[in-house]
Amino acid sequence: TFAVEYYDNKLKKFVPNPHGTQNAVLYIGTEMELVDEVEPIMLAYIADVPQDHIMDYDYAEGEYERVLYAIDILNRSQIYLEYVPDYDISTLEQTIEKYVLQKNVRHVYFDYIHITTDLIAEFQGEAKAKMQLREDQVLANVGTKLKELTRKYDISLDTWTQVSGDWKNENNRDQTIIRGAKALSDKVDCGSIMMRPTVAELRKIDPILKNRFGGQKPNLY
């Protein structure tokens, strides 16, 4: 976490977070509204209050006060948000460079890799010959460019992309279901496909749960 404090549910109080004072982070969003959608997620995490309580303005005892204090924490933290709906690589680089130079940002979260009209126009302008670019070519180029930005600015960069309709095939949940450009998987240092486990997958770990964890089920699916 990058917040300077967070609510510890065991201690029932806010506690300092040394990682929050030593690191600056930039979130670049392309779809979700920063104030209405992204900030409530952050406040829910910092205050340990269910997000729907914040969105519905329906608080249990003590939650409203915690959210108010979480707003103050967010303002004091080195957490920066930028909204870039129709992005291209040039815009991303300008945004990242600004925060690296002005705020000493070293961690960037980009939500998320997908096709935009500006992106297509940018790559077509850079192409040596006028040609119709395929979606997989554009997305693969985005992965290459983002990798170059991490080296150029010495930053870590986390991002996401979509999966294709093949995700429904329970026997084929690997890099081949990345939507548009399977080559994206070749550009990442660490990646994962986040999905709820199937019944068959849960059965496979039953022996481990029984022998190691007393049969306790995972608390996150």
Report residues per predicted region.
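Glycine-rich phosphate-binding P-loop
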Residues: T1-A3
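Phosphate-binding/switch region of NTP-binding enzymes
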Residues: F14, G20, Q137-Y221
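Generic beta-strand/beta-sheet core signal
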Residues: I28-T30, E82-V84, F110-I113, W160-T161, ...
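Flexible loop/turn segments at secondary-structure boundaries
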Residues: E33-E39, D88-I89, H114-L119, G165-N169, ...
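Helical mechanochemical/support elements of P-loop NTPase systems and associated helical scaffolds
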Residues: L34, V38, E63-R66, A70, ...
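Short secondary-structure boundary/capping segments
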Residues: I41-A47, F123-E126, N172-D174, L209
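Phosphate-binding/switch loop-helix module in NTP-utilizing enzymes
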Residues: Q78-L149
